[in-house]
Structure formats: structure tokens, C-alpha cells
Amino acid sequence: MEVFPAVDILSGNCVQLVGGDRLTATVYGSPMDNARRWISEGASNLHVVNLDGAFTASTTNAEMIREVVEKTDVFVQVGGGIRSLEDARGWLNCGVARIILSTFATREPAVIRTLSKEFGSERIMAGVDARRGEIAVSGWQELAGDFIVWAQKFEELGAGSLLYTNVDVEGQQAGIDIEPVQKLLDAVDIPVIVAGGVTTSQDVTALKQLGASGCVLGSALYSGRITLKEALEAAV
């Protein structure tokens, strides 16, 4: 199972939020410094999110994200604020390995098919951010229907993988909620990466045993509740 340290960027800083609330932001320095840190500790993947883009304009922090992509040689997936085909193509053409489409894919599902045909499904990930069983969009401020129905729709449209984020436990460092993860894995055949609540090596092991293809480490990694070494060992 793959492990993705998160590099979440807000106002030019690497941060971690609780439940997607920008008022809860804890700052952890520069995005590039953190990217280099996780790579030096063994990361071969990075999960980069433009939080300003998720809330406002998609161009904010773009240069910092490009720096991470250009100055590292690891697999970088990028999400946050991709609201148009132009945005999506821009990231895919600048060297990002995979993009995550969330609100945009929910508003205009056909873009999944368009981009998968153009760039290959393996580079197109659909974001399934769920709150109380419904997909959450627009910076997790709006609910837009059953998350399983949306996941299956994204798969049918050609998404190569899904990023499932449990908003209800995200950032709380209280462990994962197994039930919705299992429900999602049973409902689709494409790879699912899980974010939200991954706090201990036991969480990583549980996700591996369930059949998740990867997990994202955020708040627990930055606060020291889990080390990257522990997570990588549990994922083997």
C-alpha cells in the first residue's frame, strides 16, 4: 500500500487543518521544506493540496506547487481549486503525476471522461470527500448527495482512482472510521486512497487489510503521533 505525506498549502505556508476549517490552521513552515523532509525520510509519493484554491481562486500558491513538482523526483498528486479544464490541463502538462478533481467533477462530471481520454485514466483521480455519508463540495461547505453513488459515477466516467476523505474525522487524530471505507471499497473496482483520521500504524495496517491502495498522512504525521517510517513499515 502506498503512503502519501500531505503538503497542504494555505497562504504560502504548509499547514494542517481540522475538518477543513481554515481558522484551525497550524503552520508547519514552507511547502518545499516539508516536501524535502518527507522525501528524505523515505516518501516516494506526495499529496499536495492548494487549500486557497479550494476556498477561492485556483491560481493561489501555484508557483510553490510547481516548485515541488519540478524540484523533486517523486510521484506528486495535486488537488484543490481545479475548477476548469484549463486548470486541469495546466497541472497535467507541467509534470504533476495525477490530479484530484472534487467540486469540479461533481459540478461537471463529464470532465472526468474528457480528461481520462486525453491524459489517461491513471492520471485522473476523483475526490470523494464525505460528510455524514454525503459528498461534500466547495471547500466541504455544501453536501451534494450519497458518496457511494458519486463514487460509482466517477468510476463509470473513467476515473482511474478515488481519493476518499472522511471529513467527519479529518484532522482530529482520533483514528479512522472503518465502516464507510469498507462500504466504498465494496462498491467500486478502481483503486481507493484513504484520507482523514489516519493516526497510528494500526490505522495504516487496517486500511491495507481492507484493500485500500493507499493512505494520506496529515495532522498525525505533522504532530508526531505517527512517523513516516512507522507508516511505511505498516504499509508493506
Curated annotation (Swiss-Prot):
Q: Where is the active site?
A: D8 (proton acceptor), D129 (proton donor)
What EC number(s) does this enzyme carry?
A: 5.3.1.16
- CDD domains from the UniProt entry: HisA (cd04732)
Q: Give the record's GO biological process terms.
A: L-histidine biosynthetic process; L-tryptophan biosynthetic process
Query: Which reaction(s) does the protein catalyse, per the Swiss-Prot or TrEMBL entry?
Result: 1-(5-phospho-beta-D-ribosyl)-5-[(5-phospho-beta-D-ribosylamino)methylideneamino]imidazole-4-carboxamide = 5-[(5-phospho-1-deoxy-D-ribulos-1-ylimino)methylamino]-1-(5-phospho-beta-D-ribosyl)imidazole-4-carboxamide
Tell me where on the tree of life, at the top rank, the source sits: Archaea
Q: In which pathway does it act?
A: Amino-acid biosynthesis; L-histidine biosynthesis; L-histidine from 5-phospho-alpha-D-ribose 1-diphosphate: step 4/9
- Alphabetic keyword roster: Amino-acid biosynthesis, Cytoplasm, Histidine biosynthesis, Isomerase
Compartment list: Cytoplasm
* Top enzyme class: isomerase
| Pfam families, sorted | His_biosynth
According to its record, what are the GO cellular component terms?
A: cytoplasm
Presence of the UniProt keyword Cytoplasm in the record: yes
Which InterPro entries does the UniProt record give? Aldolase_TIM, His_biosynth, HisA_bact_arch, Isoase_HisA-like, Isoase_HisA-like_bact, RibuloseP-bd_barrel
Recorded GO MF terms: 1-(5-phosphoribosyl)-5-[(5-phosphoribosylamino)methylideneamino]imidazole-4-carboxamide isomerase activity
Q: What family, per the record?
A: Belongs to the HisA/HisF family.
By its UniProt entry, which PANTHER family does this protein fall under? 1-(5-PHOSPHORIBOSYL)-5-[(5-PHOSPHORIBOSYLAMINO)METHYLIDENEAMINO] IMIDAZOLE-4-CARBOXAMIDE ISOMERASE
The identity of this protein, by name, is 1-(5-phosphoribosyl)-5-[(5-phosphoribosylamino)methylideneamino] imidazole-4-carboxamide isomerase
